[in-house]
């Protein structure tokens, strides 16, 4: 359960629980996203208010609408794509406003109106003592280790597109800025990213298997609010070799 890794890294001491109130997998948004036979589920973080996720039509598009009110949670899906089969990831989002106080390099201000989250396996013998301890804590809590690495695509207030931000809690979470500043607010933005190239840019090594995909809008650290719409998330070049766990 790679969501557990995010919970441990966020300072949570309990296991994330399934926070679903509806089956998100039956929505047109989920059916257009990668691996249509898998389940997109909403997961809460212990001690955190949950952001609200709901399917909607936005500007003629199928979308997942998200509202965060001093909250943080994720909609995610478990997948498996072997390193040799990694291709691209396609996603889109629309953001009406940035979080003015946010700074993803600071623990106390690490919020973002949009995040696309990719979780990976890897050579765990290379983990630092601190990261190994975090992984052991996750294993003790859940019976499963945290991901070896997590890559997030984010929209940053000031850092330039292409910047890599290391998570203030652990260097096994890194954020790649794909949008910056206010210039493209209030419009749909579409992306296709090379997973391998972006992982290598962020971590300086080749990726392991991709084991999870998620979307996340959070405003808990800044005690603020955020809204966003996400289009379907797709793995167009890897779909033939993926499998839901």
Describe each model-derived feature in a short phrase.
Residues 12-47, 129-136, 245:
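Extracellular carbohydrate-recognition regions
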Residues 78-89, 182-185:
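Extracellular/lumenal carbohydrate-interaction signature centered on repeated Trp-anchored short motifs
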Residues 213, 232-235:
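Extracellular beta-strand elements of beta-rich domains used
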Residues 114-116, 171-181, 185-223:
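Extracellular beta-strand ligand-recognition surfaces/modules
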Residues 107-114, 145, 228:
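Short coil-to-beta strand junction motifs in C2/discoidin
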Residues 111, 121-169:
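Extracellular/luminal beta-rich ligand-recognition
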Residues 52-74:
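Short carbohydrate-recognition loop motifs
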Residues 1-11:
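Bacterial N-terminal signal peptides
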């Amino acid at each position: 359960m790679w969501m557990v890794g995010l919970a441990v890294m966020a300072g949570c001491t309990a296991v994330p629980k399934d926070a679903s109130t509806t089956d998100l997998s039956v929505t047109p948004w989920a059916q257009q996203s990668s691996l249509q036979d898998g389940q997109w589920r909403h997961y809460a973080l212990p001690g955190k208010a949950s952001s609200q996720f709901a399917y909607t039509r936005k500007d003629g598009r199928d979308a997942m609408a998200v509202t965060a009110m001093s909250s943080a949670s994720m909609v995610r899906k478990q997948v498996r794509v072997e390193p040799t089969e990694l291709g691209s990831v396609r996603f889109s989002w629309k953001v009406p406003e940035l979080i003015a106080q946010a700074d993803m390099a600071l623990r106390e201000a690490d919020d973002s109106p949009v995040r696309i989250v990719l979780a990976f396996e890897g050579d765990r013998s290379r983990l630092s003592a601190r990261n190994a301890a975090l992984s052991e804590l996750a294993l003790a809590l859940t019976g499963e280790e945290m991901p070896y690495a997590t890559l997030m695509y984010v929209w940053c207030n000031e850092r330039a597109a292409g910047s890599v931000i290391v998570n203030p809690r652990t260097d096994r979470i890194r954020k790649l800025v794909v949008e910056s500043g206010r210039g493209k607010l209030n419009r749909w933005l579409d992306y296709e990213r090379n997973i391998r190239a972006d992982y290598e840019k962020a971590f300086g090594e080749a990726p392991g298997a991709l084991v999870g995909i998620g979307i996340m809008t959070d405003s808990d650290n800044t005690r603020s609010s955020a809204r966003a719409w996400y289009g379907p998330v797709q793995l167009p070049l890897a779909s033939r070799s993926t499998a839901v766990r």
